Amino acid sequence: MTITINGQTFYATLYDNETAAALKAKLPLSLNMSEQNGNEKYNYLSFSLPTNASNPGQIHAGDLMLYGSDCLVLFYESFPTSYRYTPIGRINDPSGLADAVGHGGVQVTFALG
């Protein structure tokens, strides 16, 4: 999967699970993602995805997760967490991700590739 942010393309690997497969079926998607906590961008989708949430304990920059059944979250910083997420995939090389997403909201395009 490709994730394009402000003209910069990142390559991501989707996990082999029901949630990732359901998201893949909806691609391509261009989303206006909002800023949260200085470590993530999120968007409440207009549809729900299957869930299998657990607490990962540690979030890594580049993680793509689902919060609840309809909130897509792209993390651009690493940090410990007590929240529960359903894993979807991960950006293979998140170098430059924090700079690409910037501060505030950002348009992000998810596509097959």
Language-model segment annotations:
Residues 89-113:
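Well-ordered alpha/beta subsegment
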Residues 1-36, 40-42:
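N-terminal secretory signal peptides
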Residues 1-5, 48, 105-113:
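N-terminal non-globular leader segments, chiefly Sec-dependent signal peptides
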Residues 37-58:
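Compact, glycine-rich, soluble single-domain proteins
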Residues 75-91:
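Short, compositionally biased
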